[in-house]
Amino acid sequence: TLEVLLEEEVEIDGKAYYLGHSREYVKVAVPKTEKYGVNDILAVKVEKTLQPHILQGEEIQVL
């Protein structure tokens, strides 16, 4: 798991995501929902590579 600070809303391949960075500066996108937003910190389980240099993750918990 990674702790990710959500920094911006983006659209990738027609889907809405929040994009942020982990403490190690890894760029992570999580699907946009009403449960969290920009400036929230999430515990994220990485699922796959979404684009070069961007991982896709699933929210485990809002911290």
Give the positions of each predicted feature.
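Terminal RNA-binding accessory module
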Residues: T1-L63
